[in-house]
Amino acid sequence: MEKFITLKDTVVPLDAENVDTDQIIPARFLKATDKEGFGENLFRDWRFDKNGDPIEDFVLNQDKYSGSILLAGNNFGCGSSREHAAWAIKAYGFKAVVSSYFADIFKGNALNNGLLPVQVCPEFLTKLFVAIEKDQNEKISIDLEAQKIKIESSGESESFDIDSYKKTCLINGYDDIDFLTSKLEAIKKFEQKRRGKENVPQETI
């Protein structure tokens, strides 16, 4: 997984609440096995009409908005527990999603796939939307080590919470297996010490 330490970029504002996983990636596109291929169908039914033509007023189809940070309304990622929703957002090119609340399962799936969910208070979320509406080139910075998100032009910032284990994994670019592998030497030493006390022959370790 790619390391995530800091990120400063422009923002794509999706001003909609209760965005569920079927809206993020419709069920008919879940048969694919390549994670990278899901990006093309992100918000498929909002991005394209029944003829496959782009819906011009949808935010992902507007050239004035770009960037690797998705700004979303409250209760993002609700609905079914499909991991494909996180895959689609990540495959499209987003590295972080900012909202005032995330569904728990979506939040876990996002973190497991290297996508950072940044949960802020409703008041700060409103400030973010206002800043982007005022200037679509506004940049937002996210410092994972400091657990801070900041509006660059005004300097206004807010802290956000993240599980310490998931934070370590993101900063180091680890998935669960990578994290375990990184601890093998410490595990081996612990087992050697433990087995030594129990008089277990070293060659069995």
Swiss-Prot record:
InterPro entries per the UniProt record, alphabetical: 3-IsopropMal_deHydase_ssu (IPR004431), Aconitase/3IPM_dehydase_swvl (IPR015928), AconitaseA/IPMdHydase_ssu_swvl (IPR000573), IPMI_Swivel (IPR033940), LeuD (IPR050075)
The keyword Nucleus appears for this protein: no
MF-aspect GO terms: 3-isopropylmalate dehydratase activity
Pathway(s): Amino-acid biosynthesis; L-leucine biosynthesis; L-leucine from 3-methyl-2-oxobutanoate: step 2/4
GO BP: L-leucine biosynthetic process
Annotated TM spans: none
CDD domains: IPMI_Swivel (cd01577)
This enzyme's EC code(s): 4.2.1.33
One of the Pfam families matching this protein, by short name: Aconitase_C
GO CC entries: 3-isopropylmalate dehydratase complex
Reaction equation(s) it catalyzes: (2R,3S)-3-isopropylmalate = (2S)-2-isopropylmalate
PANTHER family: 3-ISOPROPYLMALATE DEHYDRATASE SMALL SUBUNIT, 3-ISOPROPYLMALATE DEHYDRATASE SMALL SUBUNIT 2-RELATED-RELATED
Stated family: Belongs to the LeuD family. LeuD type 1 subfamily.
Function according to Swiss-Prot or TrEMBL: Catalyzes the isomerization between 2-isopropylmalate and 3-isopropylmalate, via the formation of 2-isopropylmaleate.
Subunit structure: Heterodimer of LeuC and LeuD.
Official protein name in the record: 3-isopropylmalate dehydratase small subunit
